[in-house]
From Swiss-Prot:
This is GMP synthase [glutamine-hydrolyzing]. Residues 9-199 form the Glutamine amidotransferase type-1 domain. It comes from the Bacteria. One of its GO terms (cellular component) is cytosol. Catalyzes the synthesis of GMP from XMP. It comes from Exiguobacterium sibiricum (strain DSM 17290 / CCUG 55495 / CIP 109462 / JCM 13490 / 255-15). InterPro entries: Class_I_gatase-like (IPR029062), GATASE (IPR017926), GMP_synth_C (IPR001674), GMP_synth_GATase (IPR004739), GMP_synthase (IPR022955), GMPS_ATP_PPase_dom (IPR025777), NAD/GMP_synthase (IPR022310), Rossmann-like_a/b/a_fold (IPR014729). The keyword Iron-sulfur does not apply. The keyword Iron-sulfur does not apply.
Length: 514
């Protein structure tokens, strides 16, 4: 992932911690651009990026172990301010000659931090504050030149500083909400230590991205994959703002869309925005490929590959089509696995592309989280209907029908999902609930309808609250609204006699079921 040129940024090095993406988000929320990069990045690469500051993330390993994640030691010699969090503080301490050992017991949860001669990192903060600890190791002796400026009963070296080198470390996690003044600590690192200006905004992002798209594309043409979701819609609007009629949008109706989706896409982009939109009817082609396939990863790969093959075939009929634009998000890349994390699930936008694909990929929003994409859509002048459209995965209903896909199952999900969205909107909850949809598990149950025994499908409802999709909680939909949804589904959708409600957060679950 490329850093944005001519723009101050904070570089976050990924050492595998569960809160790493939160660090990046917190920094952006403070008006400074930030990106998460592998700990394997070289000092030369860091120098080229020229960040205003560097943050070492937390991580699950021990710095003294053979399999410890390390960074290029020359990064410490670049003269760039460094802030180490948890594992990051331990790594920095070890590098400069400090000692890191196994703690007597793991410390996890809230703790009280007491400050002594605090650094600029703690400017205007109380000398005693609540922080969030999550560690099994601790620094037992600080390196020469470093001073302890924060202690805790269970962790005597909870915060360290070397003001001459502008290097700071904390054993706790300022990026989580449980740390009372965590946001203020990060703010002080950005503005007191790194001297950032805090001028990053979505308006600024648009200006930079339009310039980048113009430079990258030149006088060539771009083919944009429209899916009907907010991500591809925003990508189309952004690229159209940059290159106008050099953009052609292709909308593939793969038979896995929500009710009314195809008509809505054509009306919005072809009629309202006057974009060049080509509609491809490929329902039979996709569904034939998916016959007999139950494994979710296989389904994702098949749908992703078939998308590209269709585009490849259709684009060959067009002239000078060099680029394929996709609505890949930052969360897509993160969830598809990094050096330090296992793949949770492959995303259609970052996996399954054939090696002989004729296009060069252009992914202008792949550094943004979902809520930032919505903000971008507003800045680009998209309607609320588009901006607040429910998130919809590229594989569509193909991963909301669990197991093998059939026409009957697709119709059940399509109709039940329409009812859910309709009732949520009627209840005025569409802005309060981050994402909501129905799924069809491979499950039948006994029921009674009209004095007759039934043996029909159970429909699952998934509704979550979230900010960026990295974590989420199940939505507390009022009981009366759930009752209306349930009654309508079992009465209006054929072959359904039961409705289930998913009350699991992320983690441990993902938002989508497949």
């Amino acid at each position: 992932m490329e850093a944005h040129l001519d723009q101050e940024m904070i570089l976050v090095l990924d050492f595998g911690g569960q809160y790493n993406q939160l660090i990046t988000r917190r920094i952006r929320d403070l008006g400074v651009y930030s990106e998460l990069h592998s700990h394997k990045i070289t000092a030369a690469e860091v120098k080229d990026i020229a960040p205003a500051g560097i943050i070492f993330s937390g991580g699950p390993r021990s710095v003294y172990a053979e399999d410890a994640y390390r960074c290029d030691p020359e990064i410490f010699d670049l003269g760039i301010p460094i802030f180490g969090i948890c594992y990051g503080m331990q790594l920095m301490s070890q590098h400069f000659g400090g000692t890191v050992e196994r703690a007597g017991h793991r410390e996890y949860g809230k703790a009280t931090l007491t400050l002594n001669d605090p650094s600029p990192m703690y400017a205007n903060l109380p000398l005693e504050q609540t922080v969030w600890m999550s560690h099994s190791d601790l620094v037992t002796s600080v390196p020469n030149g470093f001073v302890v400026d924060g202690t805790n009963v269970s962790c005597p070296i909870a915060s360290i500083k070397n003001e001459e080198l502008k290097m700071y470390g904390v054993q706790y996690h300022p990026e989580v909400n449980h740390t009372m003044f965590g946001k203020e600590l990060l703010k002080n690192f950005l503005f007191e230590v790194c001297q950032c200006t805090g001028d990053w905004s979505m308006e600024n992002f648009i200006e930079i991205e339009i310039a980048k798209i113009k430079e990258e594309v030149g006088d060539k043409k771009v083919l944009c994959a429209l899916s009907g979701g907010v991500d591809s819609s925003v990508v189309a609007a952004l690229i159209h703002a940059a290159i106008g009629d050099q953009l052609t949008c292709m909308f593939v109706d793969h038979g896995l869309l929500r009710k009314g989706e195809a008509e809505s896409v054509m009306k919005t982009f072809a009629d309202h925005f006057h974009m060049n939109v080509i509609k491809i009817d490929a329902q039979d082609r996709f569904l034939n490929k998916l016959k007999g396939i139950s494994d979710p990863e296989q389904k994702r790969k098949i749908i992703g590959n078939e998308f590209v093959y269709v585009f490849d075939e259709e684009a060959s009929k067009l002239t000078d089509m060099d680029f394929l634009a996709q609505g890949t998000l930052y969360t897509d890349i993160i969830e598809s696995g990094t050096d330090t994390a296992q793949t949770i699930k492959s995303h259609h936008n970052v996996g399954g592309l054939p090696e002989d694909m004729q296009f060069k990929l252009i992914e202008p929003i792949n550094t943004l989280f979902k809520d930032e994409v919505r903000e971008l859509g507003k800045e680009l002048g998209l309607s609320d209907e588009i901006v607040w459209r429910q998130p919809f995965p590229g594989p569509g209903l193909g991963i909301r029908v669990l197991g093998e896909i059939t026409d009957e199952k697709l119709e059940i999900v399509r109709e039940s999902d329409f009812i859910l969205r309709d009732e949520i909107k009627k209840a005025g909850l569409e802005r309060e609930i981050w994402q909501y949809f129905t799924v069809l598990p491979p499950l039948r149950s006994v029921g009674v309808m009209g004095d007759e025994r039934t043996y029909d499908y159970a429909v699952g409802i998934r509704a979550v609250t979230s900010i960026d999709g990295m974590t989420s909680d199940w939505a507390r939909i009022p009981w009366d609204v759930l009752e209306k949804i349930s009654v309508r589904i079992v009465n209006e959708v054929q072959n359904v006699n039961r409705v289930l409600y998913d009350v699991t957060s992320k983690p441990p679950s993902t938002i989508e079921w497949e």
